[in-house]
Amino acid sequence: MTVPPPLVVITGPTATGKTEVGINVALACGGEIVSADSMMVYRGMDIGTAKPSASEMRGVPHHLIDVVDPDEEFNVARYQQLAGEAIVGILGRKRVPLLVGGTGLYIRSVVEDYRFPVRADRRLRNRLQEAAELYGCARLHRHLAVVDPVTARRLHPNDQRRIIRALEVYYQSGIPFSRYPDRRDRAPKYLPVMFGLNMERGRLYRRIEDRVDAMIRAGLVREVQSLLEKGYGPELVAMKGLGYKEIAAHLRGSLTLEEAIHILKRNTRRFAKRQLTWFRRDEQIRWLDVEECGGPVGAAREIVGSIEQE
């Protein structure tokens, strides 16, 4: 039996330093990074997504960054395909693939080799979106609870995009989304070596607030204004990302800048908490406290040491 190739995964909640740690690990072990961030795939959305600059990448090849325009559809199935192709290329160059980011579903789709049940049906999706607008997303969530209670319990009643996707799967296949992916009787594609970065909650929240302030100073308002002027409206999935929806609301006059910043910090803290809840369920992840490791360089050193022992 062929031993699957190793895949190093570095994940954790936002603002824990995953990007910097990943770059340091890649430099130490001859690796290339495959981004696992659902917002970094969009071109022109740089400040609000905390994309690393060319100088910050320090010569480390990065994949799955700047893949599509903000008005193009991009989903986990497409991510899985492109990430898989990138990993094959990295392995072919005899280098180490590192999956780095905080989008749990993207990571799981690669590590667990998801089999996606059905392709998106544009007409069905439009009908479900119209129903959500007419009756409210909570009503769709209640319906999902009838046909797929497992998925309904996992999703927030206002998570319209994922609720609609789960209903799409059910209506098209007759099978609840919670029964996918089915990877039984299949050999694993990779041997995942997974690390989670974290830190004391108060420290993490202060880092989140400092990062939001830094984004504002770096020109986040100008970035969002430019996107809106190019015709990328607030209804787009990309424009509903953290930082973009709050600043867009400010630019429409719904919020003052101070209010938008306050809400963005609050929403990011809540997002980090949800990320941590998601990742804590994965027993494969080895957790590292970045502060206890002495910062990103120390955390990278710990990871490299663990990889060498595998």
Curated annotation (Swiss-Prot):
- Name the residues annotated as site: Interaction with substrate tRNA: T103, R125
Q: Reaction catalysed by this chain?
A: adenosine(37) in tRNA + dimethylallyl diphosphate = N(6)-dimethylallyladenosine(37) in tRNA + diphosphate
Please list the cofactors this protein needs: Mg(2+)
* Annotated residues for binding of ATP: G12, P13, T14, A15, T16, G17, K18, T19
| Stretch list, region Interaction with substrate tRNA | 37-40
Organism's domain of life? Bacteria
Tell me its EC number(s), please: 2.5.1.75
Q: Does the keyword Nucleotide-binding apply?
A: yes
Q: Which PANTHER family does the record cross-reference, listed alphabetically?
A: TRNA DIMETHYLALLYLTRANSFERASE (PTHR11088:SF60)
Protein name, per record: tRNA dimethylallyltransferase
Give the originating organism.
Desulforudis audaxviator (strain MP104C)
Q: Provide the gene name from the record.
A: miaA
